[in-house]
Structure formats: C-alpha cells, structure tokens
Amino acid sequence: MKITLTALVFLCFHTLGVLANAGYNIKVNIEGYRERKLTLAYYFGNQQYIKDTVKMGADGAYTFSGQTPLLPGIYTLVMTPTNVGIDLLVSEKEQQFSVQTKKASPHADLKFIGSKENELFQQYIHFVSKHNPQLDTLRAQYKRSAEGPKKEKIKQALQKVDSTVQQYLQEFLRVNKDSYAALVIKSSLSIRYPSFSGTDEEKVLKTWLYARKHCFDNVPLTEFRLLRTPHFYQAVTTYVNELLFQHPDSINAGIDYILNQLRPNREAFDYYAIHFLRQYLQPKVMGMDAVFVHLAETYLETGEIQLSNPAQKAKLIQMAQKLKPLLIGKIAPNIALTDRAGKTFNLHDLESEYTLLVIWAYDCGHCKQSAPFWKSFYEKFKDKGVKLLALCHVPEKELPTCWKYVDDNGYGAWLHAADPLFRYAKAYNVESTPQVYLMDRKKVIIGKQIVAEKMEEVIAQIIELRKKNK
C-alpha cells in the first residue's frame, strides 16, 4: 500500500487540528471589569464548586482552558468582589467559545461567539425575563382581589399571558428538540397538571399521585448531562422528601429505585447514596433511622458506596449495626434491672399496655429540663395503661445521689431502676442521655427519642392511632 507525501502532510495537519480542538477553551471579555481574577464554577447537587480561577491576560481577557473536556452542565462565571454570577451552558459538542458582556449590565449585554447552545439559552431567558414580571404582578393582583368581575378579569389576563409563554416554550422545545439548551430548559420546568375531578381531598390525592408518577418526565434520572444543573438535585430530593409516602419502607424503595438508575454513573451514584445516608443518619422524623440502617446495609457494607476514609466507613457500619435492634417495629432488648428496693426484674416482665423507658442521669442538663414534662406525662397517662420506667444511668456509688434527686424533686411516683453493671448501655446504644423508648404490651418499640415537651401530644396520637387500627 502506497501513501503519498501529500497524504502524509494532510494526515499530520488533520491530527494536529483534532488535538487543537480537544479539551475546552472559553475566552471571557467583561467591559469595565478590571479585577485580576475570574472564577468558573459549576453546579452539582445543591451546591456550586469551583472548577478554575484564572488571571486576566495581557489582552484584558480571561481564558479558561484545559486538555480534558468539561462535563456538560450549567457553569457560572463569578466576578469578584461582588460575587455576581453569569450562567452559561457547556455541552459536549461546544467546548470552545467566547463570552462578551459588561460589568455594569452583565446579563443584559451578554453575548456568545461560537456557541449556538448559549445563544438559544439566552433567547429563552430573555423571553421569560420579559414576561415573568407581568405574570408575578397579575398573580399578586389576583390573590389580593375579592371575588367578582374584577378578579375574573385578572384571571383571564393571567391565563392569556401564561398561554403566550407556554406556546412560545412548546414551540421553542419543538424546534430545538435536539439541542442541549432545550434539554436544560425542559429540566427546569414544573409539572403541568391536568384538571382533576372529585372532592377537594380527592383532588389533592390525585395531584400528589400525578406528581409522583411524572416527577422525572423533564429530568430523566439516566440523563447524566443534567447532573451539573440545579434541576437534577431538585427533582431527586423533591421525589424522596415530598412525593413518597413518608414511611421507611416507601422511602427505602424510592431511594433504591433512584440509585439503581444512577448506577451507570459512579459519580452520581456515590454522591446521592452518601447524600441520603447522611440525611437519615440523624433524621428529623421519628423512625426514619430505619432508612439509614437500610442504606448502610445495602450499599455501605456491600462496598457499593465508595468512601475514601475506611475509618469513617467502619464507623457508619457500626452505627447501623447498633441501631438495627432498636428500630421501631423491633422487640425491645430485654434487660435485667434492680428497683430502689433492691428487687431484680426483667423489662419484659412488666405488665402494662404501654411501657415508656427513659434512660436518664441526675447530672444531665437535658434530663433536668425534661423531668417536669415526664412528671406531667405520668400524671395524665398513668391511668391509661402507660407504665413509666426511669433507668438511672450512673455508677453504683452515685445511686444514692440519684435517688435523693428523685425524692427532692417529687419524681418518685413512677418506677425507678438501675443496673450498676451497665448491661443495658450496649443493648440500648446509650451514648448520651436521655434516651426514650415507647413499647406496646409485647414490648415492641412503637416510638422512640420523643422530646419531653411533645411527649403527651405524640404518645396520645400513637395510642389513638393504634386504637383505630385494631
């Protein structure tokens, strides 16, 4: 096979051209901006991260460049010291372009050279920016207006402007359906609901079910080009926090579904797995620690979540193992205790419709603040089948001081006990006080870590709910 000199020269220059076009090169000119540095940041999750900071060149421009292409997403040019940001799109195909604007009006005078995607993006933003103030004004007027002809007129005007925006949007997305700009813009859109029939309660339920079903219509979980936009995180967290039934089983299934979709992308999988692991490590809602245990067992112990710190991984796994026997729905660990008279008994031997176990200490500030509420709770619930068991968490030599504190403050009416060997401490993972567990007759945990101020209200609701479900 013969290769001519001309062909070799062509191949050489073609290869150099390809190499020259590899990576990214974004040149920025901001008229009136004379600061030494300009920063390029990107979205990921619910935060922005700095990609690079460059110095002003001799020509007054700022050039961001690198041999490895940028991952697609919404990036932000950040001016100092005001931290004013200018958003721009970076797609897989457009990594080399120029940006021009003015410091005094960075958004109004924003122009792009060599980036069709950003031209489309700005076209959409300008249109929406023009109509949004009008929509906001009409919505405010509609909200303030009393029922009548005036309100109906405002409603019609609102519908007309909204219809104009929607028509433009749908046409924009249709014409530019293959563009990255259209993908990003669509991901920012809220769900539009059909009209639902039925009672107000039925309409609310249908709306919620529709939102859950269509949550990822505009933000497909497998569309990883949207990872570096704020819309991806918003869709994922809205689905879990607002559109799932807030019960551990439902949340576990929902997070499993999300992570399964994200598996092909290691960065996304690790980020959201760790995000939810942290969220449910210290949940705000009682019983949701079961989600943490599930995630730790399913993804951490199996090695699917990659943590750079082995010690942290081991600690989280250990925490899950300690929490698992204490989850709501589990039978409370049986423990041997001694009452103030020296009589030994087992927790499971207590005969009562409900047992409230409080592990406390006389020198614990939080316990001291909570004790009056425990007393009030006991007085109101002692005749409703609730037994209060207070377990003093102190060494044997301090028990006399503990009992004196009980007597001096009038807390002796309910059952008090101790275990100088601290055998309960491991079983109930006592690393701080107070610890609170509500159990039913069979000593199944039905509530835990109930704050003293809300104890009467929460336990009354639990008891009432259990009565209805019988």
Feature names for model-found ranges:
Residues K206-A273:
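Structured, charged N-terminal subsegments at the starts of enzyme catalytic cores
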Residues A20-K177, V184-C215:
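A non-transmembrane, solvent-exposed segment enriched in polar/low-complexity residues
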Residues F345-W374, K387-L389:
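Short active-site neighborhood of thiol/selenol oxidoreductases, capturing the structured segment around
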Residues V175-Y180, R266, Q306:
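Short solvent-exposed coil/turn linkers within tandem alpha-helical repeat scaffolds
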Residues M1-N29, R466, K470:
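Bacterial Sec-dependent N-terminal signal peptides
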Residues Q282-T338, H348-D349, P400, K404:
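N-proximal helix/coil linker or "cap" segments that precede and/or mark the start of modular domains
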Residues Y411, L421-I462:
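Thiol/disulfide oxidoreductase modules built on the thioredoxin-like
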Residues Q369-D407, P420-K426:
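Structural microenvironment flanking redox-active thiols in thiol-disulfide oxidoreductases
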